[in-house]
C-alpha cells in the first residue's frame, strides 16, 4: 500500500513539474518570439504549423510523458526474486535465467517490463530538468541579461545543433539515470528478500 501511495505521489509530482515547464516554455516563447522566428524545436521547424502546431506538439509530448510516468510509477511491478547478486538479478529479470548475464545488456531482453520501466523512469525524471534549460534560455533572452555567465552559457548552447543542448542532456541524463534505476530496483529486491526472511 505504501509503495502505491509513493508511486502515485511521484506520478503526480513528475507530471505537474513537466506540465509547468511546458506552460513556462510556451509563455516565454510567446513573449520572446510571437511570430516563432526564433523557435528551435526541430519537430516544429519541419512542419511550420504555427502556434496551433506548436501547442498540438506539446500536448502530444505531454500525453506521451503521462504514459511513461504511469508505467514507471504505477503500472510496473518489480519482480520477486531471491537473487542477492546484481548480475544474476539483472539476468533473471531481463532474460528469465540468472545464469545468462549479458554484459552491458546488449542482447534484447526476453522480459520487456524491466527495460521499459527503466527507460520510462529515466526519461520521466530527466525531462523536466532539461525542459527548464529552454525556459532559462528564453528568460535570459527576454530580460536581455548580459554578463560573463550568460555569455558562457549561450556559447555552450551554440555548440549544439539548433542550440538544442536540452536534447543532448536528456539523452545523457536518461542513460546515467538508467544505472540509478537498476541500483534502486536491486536495493528494493534485497529489502524484500530480508523482509521475507524475517517473516519466516
Role assignments for model-derived ranges:
Residues 2-200:
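Hydrophobic alpha-helical segments at protein termini of multi-pass membrane proteins
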Amino acid at each position: 500500500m505504501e509503495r502505491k501511495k509513493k508511486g502515485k505521489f511521484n506520478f503526480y509530482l513528475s507530471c505537474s513539474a513537466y506540465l509547468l515547464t511546458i506552460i513556462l516554455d510556451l509563455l516565454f516563447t510567446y513573449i520572446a518570439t510571437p511570430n516563432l522566428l526564433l523557435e528551435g524545436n526541430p519537430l516544429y521547424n519541419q512542419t511550420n504549423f504555427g502556434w496551433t502546431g506548436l501547442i498540438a506538439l506539446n500536448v502530444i509530448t505531454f500525453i506521451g510523458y503521462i504514459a511513461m510516468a504511469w508505467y514507471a510509477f504505477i503500472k510496473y511491478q518489480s519482480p520477486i526474486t531471491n537473487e542477492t547478486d546484481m548480475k544474476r538479478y539483472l539476468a533473471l529479470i531481463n532474460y528469465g535465467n540468472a545464469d545468462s548475464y549479458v554484459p552491458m545488456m546488449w542482447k534484447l531482453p526476453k522480459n520487456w517490463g524491466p527495460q521499459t520501466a527503466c527507460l520510462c523512469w529515466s526519461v520521466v525524471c530527466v525531462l523536466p530538468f532539461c525542459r527548464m534549460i529552454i525556459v532559462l534560455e528564453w528568460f535570459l533572452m527576454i530580460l536581455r541579461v548580459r554578463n560573463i555567465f550568460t555569455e558562457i552559457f549561450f556559447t555552450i548552447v551554440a555548440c549544439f545543433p539548433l542550440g538544442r543542448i536540452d536534447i543532448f542532456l536528456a539523452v545523457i541524463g536518461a542513460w546515467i539515470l538508467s544505472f540509478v534505476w537498476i541500483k534502486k530496483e536491486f536495493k528494493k529486491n534485497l529489502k524484500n528478500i530480508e523482509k521475507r526472511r524475517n517473516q519466516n
